[in-house]
Amino acid sequence: MLFRSTLMNKGLELIEAVWLFGLPPEKIQIVVQRQSIVHSAVQFSDHSVIAQLGVPDMRIPIQYALTYPKRVPGVVPELDFAALKVLTFDVADEETFRCLAACKKAIKKGGLGPCAANGANEEAVKLFLEDKIGFLDIGRLVEAVVDSDRFGGDYTLSDVYECDRMAREFVRAHL
């Protein structure tokens, strides 16, 4: 739930979409859907949209990941379209949600930037849950890690683990 409060989840989804679909980040619009019913949407060249909707429950994507490519009977209630009434969408404010801005910077930076952003976020959230930093410090620390010059360039798998460790260490050193 904390990832949703900082919009780090949206930043990680952006990184994921850039990697999986080979799209530049500018082609991906991030919006906040407050009812948490619309989980993803794709707009095609004819401007039609296909969206994935469902009740807000992480058991759905976890179940699908475990049973792919089959769709098995769900363990969550059906989505009641009549009860929805309205779906609202807001532009994600990157000044308020610094984790999202940091993820965009990490993509542009390339190399291990996305790994550093993730490691920094996990460490900052841990420190927040331990009452060692304030909520707004999470975004500040993730941005500081991404803005540092430590995490660019080519890399190996062992570099990924080292980057994660160093990002967490950086966060602890910059409390």
Walk through the language-model features, giving the residues of each.
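Catalytic, metal-anchored helix/loop core of enzyme active sites in primary metabolism
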Residues: 1-175
